[in-house]
Amino acid sequence: MSGAGNREQVFPTRMTLGVMKSKLKGAQQGHSLLKRKSEALTKRFRDITQRIDDAKRKMGRVMQTAAFSLAEVQYATGDNISYQVQESVQKARFTVKAKQENVSGVFLPTFDSHINEDVNDFKLTALARGGQQVQKAKLIYSKAVETLVELASLQTAFIILDEVIKITNRRVNAIEHVIIPRTENTIAYINGELDEMDREEFYRLKKVQEKKQEAAAAAEQEEALAKAKAEGATDELAIQQDVEALDIKADKEEVDILQEKEDDVIF
């Protein structure tokens, strides 16, 4: 049993062979599906990687502009504008909604930002001076937050896809290099054992047939000998009967001769 460690420990029967063939077919189909899934995820992963790179570049430019804008606001207002902004906020103008996107069976969380144009709690902020700079900073920071939300969504998807792709590739490699070869070796082992059993069965049936033929030939030979003995006994009986008949006939002829002699003596 060479290579017994590279196959499953099963009893070689035709039922087991059918089970192993079904398992091999399932493994091949699973390998094909996982391979396509890995390719689809890898394609999406590369797209997300490119988008993350673009978003980071955009984020750098936006945050630089926002920093200059905030400096302009502080220069124009001349006081602590952040305190006024915090006191002016009554309702959330900027909201973030989360949803899930299905990519080849993998659910990726995505974040969408929404701006409620009906809410404007900063219209009276810095009304005395610096109002224009405040509105400009508000727009720039709104774009910065949108970019941050987009970047957070992309990076979350990046982390999840990276882990899922690694797991999928490990499964693909395990099926390709372990499960399928082991199942094929098991099928080859079962086929070899079944062929060996078929040859043994054929040899056994051949021997049984030869024994039957020898027994039939011996029976025919015994029957022929018995028949020959019976025929020989019949011939001996017939010869003996013929001999006895000849003896009786000879005795009768001798008696007749003696009687004739006696008749001649009387005359």
Swiss-Prot record:
Any one GO biological process: vacuolar acidification
InterPro entries according to UniProt: V_ATPase_D
Membrane topology of the entry: Peripheral membrane protein
Keyword Ion transport included in the entry's annotation: yes
Location(s) in or outside the cell: Vacuole membrane
Coarse class of the protein's main subcellular location: membrane
Swiss-Prot/TrEMBL keywords: Hydrogen ion transport, Ion transport, Membrane, Transport, Vacuole
Function: Subunit of the V1 complex of vacuolar(H+)-ATPase (V-ATPase), a multisubunit enzyme composed of a peripheral complex (V1) that hydrolyzes ATP and a membrane integral complex (V0) that translocates protons. V-ATPase is responsible for acidifying and maintaining the pH of intracellular compartments.
Assigned protein family: Belongs to the V-ATPase D subunit family.
Protein name, entry field: V-type proton ATPase subunit D
Source lineage: Eukaryota, Fungi, Dikarya, Ascomycota, Saccharomycotina
